[in-house]
Regions:
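Structured C-terminal helix/loop/strand segments within mature extracytoplasmic catalytic/sensor domains
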Residues: 149-198
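Non-transmembrane alpha-helical segments in soluble domains
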Residues: 11, 15, 38-42, 53-54, ...
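A beta-strand-loop signature enriched in Asp, Gly, Thr, and Trp
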Residues: 68-77, 99-123
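Carbohydrate-binding/catalytic loop surfaces
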Residues: 71-84, 130-141
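Catalytic-site signature segments of enzymes, centered on catalytic residues
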Residues: 1-80
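Active-site-proximal alpha-helical segments within enzyme catalytic domains
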Residues: 33-40, 80-101, 153-170
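Active-site Gly/Thr loop motif
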Residues: 8, 63-66, 113-166
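Structural helix-adjacent loops and short alpha-helical linkers that scaffold large soluble proteins
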Residues: 42-54, 100-108, 124-125
Length: 198
């Protein structure tokens, strides 16, 4: 991660790294790969990822999306450093929980949410299945989907229980890692789910 963000050209740096496995083989999450999506979207749309996020999510959900870090070429970070409030992040989780619907509008193509939740690989760190930007973790007998950020930031969506959970944590290094993530899941399963069911 360090050599990548300290390079002069993040996209070039990612594209010139060797594969960790053959295509279709072992998956190793890479923030650099997520950044490539931001670069491709910026290039194809002719607009910044920030502008698109504000138009496609910020305006319809009535959330504030502040500017975040960019690479040396001016492309907004595709893998991290967004600074959403917990309430605004919960609105994005609710949008996914409702399959991309906001009232009677679809903000995403109809099958996008289900497609994004299909297992495409497994985390080398947690062994959790991974789709398009979402990991899977069942809790209390129901499948849930989560995105996690540095330092223990967590968005967890459980459609069957009509539940969206946002957890924020101290992002001061070092990152607490997978053991902390498991404690967050335990908190959801043992305390939050029973609280909303009662």
């Amino acid at each position: 991660y360090g050599p990548w963000v300290n390079s002069d050209n993040w996209v070039h740096h990612v594209l010139t790294r060797p594969f960790v496995d053959e295509p279709g083989g072992r998956m190793l999450y890479s923030t650099g790969s997520s950044h490539l999506l931001s670069a491709a979207l910026t290039e194809s749309a002719g607009r910044s990822t920030l502008d698109l996020a504000r138009e496609w999510l910020g305006e319809p959900l009535n959330i504030t999306i502040p500017a975040w870090d960019r690479d040396p070429q001016g492309i907004y970070f595709g893998g991290n450093n967004m600074a959403l409030s917990p309430r605004d992040l919960a609105k994005i989780g609710e949008l996914y929980r409702n399959e991309g619907r906001l009232g009677d509008r679809h903000l995403f193509p109809e099958n996008w949410v289900r497609e994004s939740w299909i297992e495409r690989g497994r985390s080398a760190y947690t062994d959790d299945p991974y789709g398009y930007g979402w990991f899977q973790q069942p809790l209390a007998g129901e499948m849930g989907y989560y995105g996690r950020g540095y330092g223990g930031q967590l968005l967890y969506v459980m459609p069957a229980r009509k539940l969206t959970v946002v957890m924020t944590s101290d992002p001061t290094p070092p990152s607490p890692g997978s053991a902390f993530l498991r404690r967050q899941f335990q908190l959801i399963e043992e305390h939050i789910i029973p609280a909303v069911e009662n």
